[in-house]
Amino acid sequence: MAKNTYQPIVLINEALFKLHSPVTDNTVITEFIPYLSIAQELYIEPIIGTALSEELKQQISTNTLTPENGDLIVKIAPVLSFYTVYQGLPFKWATVLNKGVTVRESENSKSVDIKDIAQLRSWLKNDAEVLASQLIDYLCKCREHYPLWMPSDECACKNTYSEGSATKKFESGIFFKHKNKTCNTCKR
């Protein structure tokens, strides 16, 4: 009798993960594989949506990736890589065993403490959020190639800058309350 096993389809391969993640070449990548599918589900799928995610997975599983979707995978890779390390880092530091949670140490190295892990995770998350914003900008600019992508906030694409016009309004840290604009008032 054959076992039913769930095999998630991840959007990036090991080469793309190594290329875009902050881990060193001598890191055992297989330890991050479980966190790859978790990060994909938690952070990438909400950005690209279920329909586009399913299309990418189907094309990856049948090895029929379109050039446009191949470009999208390359844009997804840095975001997914950073979020994967963000998700997996605590479990590289500590291990859950039958006797409890233990911190990994060896004769040649000493683990960092929980404060250091928290700081590293903060840096990883900050970088991942910037990369996620760049992914959304890419999807906005190339929207005609991704008809299955339906952003939850239609106004998000309004603020996307085109190359050479990356100007940003001044933010002083002082908040002046004004009426919220609904998406119906966005001009394209």
Residue ranges and their predicted role:
Residues 1-77, 91-99, 103-188:
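Conserved short "hinge" loops at termini or chain/domain junctions
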